[in-house]
Every structure is written in C-alpha cells, then in structure tokens.
Regions:
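Surface-exposed coil loops of outer-membrane beta-barrel proteins
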Residues: 4-61, 203-206
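Outer-membrane beta-barrel pore domains
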Residues: 61-209
C-alpha cells in the first residue's frame, strides 16, 4: 500500500531519497548490513557549503515465522553545532493475509534533517498494518505519535504546535497489475488544544508502468 509518506519522510527526520554511496554486506543467511555515505540534503538539494555528508549504518535481521527487524543510525556533521543524529528501530511481521509494523524514530540536535540546532530533539513511533480481503481489496490502518523535547526555561515543548498524533485508515483496491485506488481518512490530533485538529478524506490513484 502507498497511502502516505513513511514516518521519517512525513516528519522530516530524513530525505525520501538521496545521492551517495551505499554498500550492502550479507553477514550470514539472516543478517544484512548496509553502510552508506550520502549528500545529506536529499537528491533535490546541492551539497552544503561545508561539504559535510551523512554517514551511517543499518542492520536488517530476518527473524523466524515471518518476523523481521531493522536497526538504523546516521550522523551528519554541522557547522558550529553538534552533529545531527537520526536513529530508528523497526519490527515487522508479514504473512500471506497481511502485514504489521512498529517503528520508533529519534532525531537529535535538529529541527529537521537539514536544520541543525543543539539540544532540539524529536522522537516518535508509528504502528501500521494491512489485511488482504477477497476480490483484490485491502484494509489498512496507521497510528503515529510525534513529540519534541522541552528546552530549559520553557513550559512547553519547542515544537508544541506541531506535536501530536495521526490516525489514518481506509481501503485499497487493485484494479489490475500496476493500478491501485484507495480511499482513506486522516485525523491529526494536536497536543496544543488551541489548534483545531485536521481531518481529511481523500481518494488516491496509483499507476505503475
């Protein structure tokens, strides 16, 4: 299913795609390691003036009985500030009838992956799943929680107006190979009760050639 950006993309913990070097090592039949050196600003942006790159490592382990796990860490040096670090942990389950996933993400010393700021941290988790139905239908649901830390001398988190939770659910229909339609409902519930919560009902189409 393709109904929304990943947690990392949605909350700008990392770029959806980037330019650089990635090498994969098969350590054994169950464990794979990736080592990468990337531009750090995403493929749409040029290298920063200081020439700093994003470097990191990830481990993917294939657990028994349809379970899998992934640990990820990267670091991006910044001028006149501590390095931006981004880490995540994923646990998933996949079977013929559906999928489940749970991930936790943490971004340190940054407002987002391109904007360094000492002591500004964000973290959150995402739970999602899908269930296949007869006649090429599929149900899906997702819940996110995103938060930021409280800085010294402040009473609220530094990103309080954008902290909160996202609930999304809907159904998807695969008309033929490469053609999918889905309808979904999204509700973002702000931690700041003064801000009106945002809800959207949308219909999407996906075409792959």
């Amino acid at each position: 299913m393709c109904i929304r950006d990943s947690f990392q993309d949605e909350y700008k913990f990392g770029a959806s795609a980037d330019l650089g070097f990635n090498s994969e090592f098969k350590l054994n039949s169950k464990l794979t390691m990736n080592v990468f050196f990337l531009n750090g600003e995403g493929y749409k942006n040029v290298q920063d003036n200081d020439g700093n790159i994003r470097q990191g490592v990830s481990f993917f382990y294939d657990l028994p009985k349809g379970f899998e796990t992934r640990i990820y860490f990267d670091s991006h040096d910044a001028k006149d500030a501590s390095a931006i670090t981004n880490s995540s942990f994923f646990l998933g389950y996949k079977a013929d009838g559906g999928r489940l996933g749970l991930e936790y993400n943490k971004l340190n010393n940054a407002r987002n992956y391109k904007s360094s700021e000492d002591g500004y941290n964000r973290d959150g988790f995402s739970i999602y799943g899908s269930k296949k139905l007869p006649k090429n239908y599929e149900l899906f649901v997702r819940y996110d929680q995103i938060s930021s830390n409280i800085l010294s001398g402040e009473s609220n988190a530094w990103n309080y107006n954008n902290d909160g939770s996202l609930l999304m659910f809907g159904t998807q229909y695969q008309a033929t190979k490469g053609v999918k339609f889905n309808i979904n409902y999204r509700l973002f519930n702000h931690d700041n009760s003064v801000i009106n919560n945002k809800s959207i009902l949308s219909l999407n189409a996906e075409f792959k050639i």
